[in-house]
Amino acid sequence: MIRIGMGQIEIVPGNPRKNRDTILQAIEYAKALRIDSLILPELALSGYLIGDAWDQPAFVNECVAMGETIIKATDNIAVIFGNVGLDPDKTNFDGRPRKFNAIFAAQNGELITPQEAPYPFIIKTLNPNYRFFNEARYFTPLPIVAQELHRPVEELLGLLPFTFKNGETFNVAPLLCEDSWDENYSFSPTTTLADKSAIQNVPIHAFINISASPFTLGKNERRHRLFTERARALKTPVFYINSVGLQNNGKSICTFDGQSTVYNRFGEIVTQLPAYESIVQPVLLDKLKPVANDDSCAMYGIADLKDGHPTVKPAVEVPVPSEPAQIYHALHYGLQSFLKQTGIKKIVIGVSGGIDSALNAALYATVLD
């Protein structure tokens, strides 16, 4: 039986040292829970919406250095986290040192990488470039690396192979946020990983998607539909890990709502973490009992412990708050976080009697002590 930790942490944008400390605390807590592998969000050290801080070499180097301290802290545990990957010998389109939005995986102080990977980290394949997502401005995607190496991008994707203290092997198919939202792209990282697994006869025990996904009304329901379909089609559990917090790129201020979720191999939700809460939650996986004519039963299922014995974890009904409730929760959390980040303790509102000022006054009345 394997214990996977859902590391839904609050990330402070532009503060790698504070985020490093948060991650180290999460790792120590995970060790106390006897978790085998802790999964953390995308760009967990830097934050996601940080604007042109990516153009500052000192900031990027600090993110890399803080990542190295995380790697060193992985004695007796595996940790998967998002950070910036750096290749100082090459340049981005803007002439600055080449950066990647990347997944790092470490165990017992050493990096774990797919044998196909051209770097000691996993590069994001699909970089979004719409609305306030502007990754193409700062990061080089995997297809560009494949083109430079004169290799198909499929060859550079692979699994993270872990071996835990009980001798169990556990193969993870790693994806970064947009890599799962591939319906409008010509290439599907998810399908590629699944096809390679089948061809090479190497099982995928879980798909993971680490994300920095801002709150958008209705997005959680769309996400559930996406990952339910993927888990059911692939007959494999899916772990979606998102961050919480407030981030600001200078133009847009976004709340990150978490709601990290685990889907079993039937696409059913078995765990969903609360919105806007920082939490490390263990999830048990147990090998499925063999069933005739079902090759997938060489895999793992989501489990509960009952009287010390693993049982199948049942699906849960996830209540969907009303749209006004979701909007209010996002506004309340966002205002509270913004005041905390800026140190503002008092608000002056010119109340005109109109709906705008009245709504603001009502909102701040619920936020201010």
Show the residue positions of the predicted features.
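Enzyme catalytic cores with a strong preference for nitrogen-chemistry domains
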Residues: 1-350, 358-369
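Conserved G/P- and acidic residue-centered "switch" motifs that form tight phosphate/ATP-binding loops
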Residues: 354
